[in-house]
Amino acid sequence: MPRWTPLLVGITALWAASTAQAGSFDLNLGDNAIELNLAAPIAEGIAIGAGVLHSEYREDATMLHGQIMGVERNRRMDIGVGARWTQFNTDYGNGGGLGLGGYGYVYLPNAPAVSVGGYGFFTPSVATSGKLDDSFLAGARVRYDFTPTVDGYVGYRRMTADFDDQRSSRTLDNSVHVGVNLRF
């Protein structure tokens, strides 16, 4: 059993127990990576979320995150901006940090079921702990709304981190993936 499986089960159980209102479940898979994200609103326009990304791109790396975001979703756009704590457990080093970032998607006027956009988070060295110096996550996706509650997507993700014992930033994930997002 992979070492991240208990974390995945724990995050899922905590999230399921804490959400009585609408939320989302997002799962994506690539050749060398799997990611699961869960989110739930806590007030009008504010959502909390948690997730895990396990990548075997070059070395073994597991990243857990928790976030709070200001969010807005309507027929034209889907955006969120906020803070995210990311904890790294990698072959290069371990540590965590508080980053800022968000996501933004625009629905195409001539194809209203299709949206394009991306996301990014940056964690500077001033907001890190352990061996982590800084990290950067960026990605892009093309999404298709199969139903009002189900999106499918194709995306690209790149995550880098700089650790104390390394000479330069390390790429922890660099992958194309496919995924599904369920909203309930």
Question: Which functions belong to the PLM regions below?
Answer:
Residues 1-24:
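Cleavable N-terminal export/targeting peptides
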Residues 18-70:
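Short glycine/proline- and aromatic-enriched beta-strand/turn motifs that initiate or cap beta-hairpins
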Residues 29-33, 52-58, 70, 83-89, ...:
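Transmembrane beta-strands of outer-membrane beta-barrel pores
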Residues 30-34, 44, 58-64, 77, ...:
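Residues that define the transmembrane beta-barrel architecture of outer-membrane proteins
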Residues 37-41, 67-71, 103-107, 141-143, ...:
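Transmembrane beta-barrel domains of outer membrane proteins
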Residues 44-50, 73-79, 110-116, 144, ...:
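Repeated loop/turn-to-beta-strand initiation elements of outer-membrane beta-barrel proteins
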Residues 63-109, 116:
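Hydrophobic, well-structured mid-protein blocks that either form specific transmembrane helices
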Residues 144, 171-184:
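Outer-membrane beta-barrel "beta-signal"
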